[in-house]
Amino acid sequence: MRVLVTGGAGFIGSHIVTALREAGHEPVVLDALLPSAHPTAPAPGAAAPPAEFVHADVRDAWSVAAVLRGVDAVCHQAAMVGLGRDFADAPDYVSCNDLGTAVLLAAMAETGVRRLVLAGSMVVYGEGRYDCLRHGPVRPGARRPEDLAAGLFEPRCPDCGSALTPG
């Protein structure tokens, strides 16, 4: 299977590229090599076994559509993590993560690529503060495997089990 790994030169992406190659698949790496993620840019293929490398930004619709031709599936890892130094970085963060994902999804629809593995973030598994109506600010632990297996993905108050809202 030919698999596009966006952000494939990053830490997680490069490990996915390695696993794909070892499983007999053909990984294709698309990475912008942004200085915020790669202070010293890796040479294409240096972080993983040799793979086709496309130096492009996931927000570039033309480049994304071009690299998707002939691809069977996508593993989307391209993202900015955290907000960098301060909230002034928020526009870049939203542009890369939200616009980049939207550009990728539109290009996948245009080119007929129907398989996608979408990376989440630590926010999904409960990192951060939440508010309970009865107990105020709480920090729930990691989701319980039995809750996840039952499709219960939202965090609950560790004291009373009530639904929480992000704090």
What are the roles of these predicted feature ranges?
Residues M1-G167:
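N-terminal Rossmann-like NAD(P)+-binding domain of SDR-like oxidoreductases, especially those catalyzing
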